[in-house]
Amino acid sequence: PKNEPILTRNFLVGILIEGAIIALNTMIAFHTGLYYGAGMAAGAATVGSTMAFATLCLSRLMHGFNSKADHPVLFQKEMFNNRYLNLSFLVGFALLSAVLLLPLKPLFKVVTLTPMLYGVIIGCAAMNVVEIQVIKAIRTHLKKKR
């Protein structure tokens, strides 16, 4: 509606919930890095920080797909129909990979991780998409009931 503010109550609640989900999955990645990084030469805190950084970056890239619509778009053509969003995701992923896998590591103070830990990063970031899409499905269902 014309007179409705940009930041409505529902919109702010959605932002808060989505931010909390991303934060929770980032903390899970950090604590996983602390646990598995204890035996690594780089040290547990550095491994945990690297995992949190990578998870947060990848989560924000993936969150662009979540932000396309108020209704769930997971497993629909609509999810990938914006070529500029797809391109920006790929560029962002390439930049993150350059930070994690190439000689840019010292600049960002990140360390080499095991393949399993990279899998945890991807898993935690992907879980954000799934969890937020489920919440959007629930919210859409509840709106229809009203």
How would you describe each model-predicted region?
Residues 1-146:
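C-terminal transmembrane helices and immediately adjacent loops/tails
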